[in-house]
């Protein structure tokens, strides 16, 4: 299965019981290389990804500045140190799950809820961890 298939079928899929989808999603290598992304995933800067990776290594580094992706600033609200970063901006937000080799990004807006985005992103991330990725 290609990485694009994971993005299209597992991240940008219809959310169970609703007719809703994430706004954008991507799978990147921890080096910042794009493995696959949805058509509308924001054009990001390498230093934005470096800051996300640093947060996974040293939890709390993004709290003062926020998580920036494609020029959009998300307030970091919670997460699981070394595994998940969650951020909020207005009615939407972002969830980033780290596996051994990849970063999985999900971006959402209403009517998608933070919990729905977290479930989609973290479910794929947990699967990839189980597969040794």
Curated annotation (Swiss-Prot):
Q: Which residues cross the membrane?
A: none
Under InterPro entries, the record lists: PFN, PFN_euk, PFN_sf, Profilin_CS
Give me the disulphide-bonded residues: 95-117
Quote the PROSITE patterns the UniProt record gives.
PROFILIN
Give the tissue specificity. Expressed in pollen.
Protein keywords: Actin-binding, Allergen, Cytoplasm, Cytoskeleton, Disulfide bond
Cell compartments where the protein resides: Cytoplasm, Cytoskeleton
* Protein's UniProt name: Profilin Sal k 4.0101
